[in-house]
């Protein structure tokens, strides 16, 4: 008896797509996906090939400190997405089941992000922070400056990982301005 065993990798081999500029962010970017989006306007004005990878409702840092790295929705935070760019594996993002309103574009966006040839990306815009603020994400940890479950720790971790993997990449953070909430 001859047994033939086929191994299927968890992630299909995709044709990598080159982009000059990638945008990550929350609903400010994610909910506007047409020719009026910031990514589309930048592409129109500069001729750079831009991709809008914004996902509404997401955060910069990881969200569930109780579960730590076992919470799959954390993989769509900016920190989680950057980790996937660096290791070139979007397998965990494909396991996330989002059932909230206005997320019908998530599956396509996450699939597209997994195909981007990040070695070709020149500029990464990360626009995030309001959801971190409103969800009560701590500003930073005194014991771990790279704690991705804090806002500043996530920024430090993102910059460190990207600098090590893509030293020529320009990283631009667009964070919310100071606002007084009552």
Features from the language model and the residues they span:
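Residues at the starts of beta-strands that form the adenosine-phosphate
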Residues: 20, 49, 168-171
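Conserved SGNH/GDSL esterase-like catalytic core that processes O-acyl groups on lipids
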Residues: 28-141, 145
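Short hydrophobic segments within beta-strands
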Residues: 24-25, 174
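Short, conserved loop/helix-junction motifs that constitute active-site signature segments
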Residues: 14-16, 118-119, 164-166
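Non-membrane alpha-helical structural segments and their capping/turn regions in soluble enzymes
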Residues: 103, 145-156
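A general structural detector for well-ordered alpha-helical segments in enzyme core domains, enriched
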Residues: 38, 112, 151-158, 162
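Active-site segments of SGNH/GDSL-like serine hydrolases
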Residues: 125-137, 159-182
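Gram-positive cell-envelope targeting signals
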Residues: 1-18, 22
């Amino acid at each position: 008896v001859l047994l033939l065993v086929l191994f299927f990798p968890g992630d299909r081999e995709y044709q990598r797509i080159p982009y000059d500029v990638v945008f990550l962010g929350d609903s400010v970017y994610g909910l506007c996906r047409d020719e009026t989006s910031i990514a589309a306007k930048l592409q129109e004005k500069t001729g750079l090939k831009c991709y809008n990878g914004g996902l509404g409702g997401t955060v910069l840092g990881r969200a569930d400190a109780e579960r730590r790295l076992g919470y799959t929705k954390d993989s769509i935070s900016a920190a989680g997405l950057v980790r996937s760019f660096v290791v070139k594996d979007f397998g965990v993002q494909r396991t996330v089941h989002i059932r909230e309103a206005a997320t019908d574009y998530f599956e396509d966006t996450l699939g597209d992000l997994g195909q981007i040839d990040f070695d070709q990306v020149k500029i990464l815009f990360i626009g995030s922070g309001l959801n971190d603020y409103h969800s009560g994400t701590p500003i930073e940890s005194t014991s771990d400056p790279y704690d991705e479950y804090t806002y500043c720790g996530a920024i430090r971790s993102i910059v460190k990982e990207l600098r090590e993997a893509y030293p020529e990449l320009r990283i631009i953070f667009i964070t919310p301005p100071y606002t007084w909430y009552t």
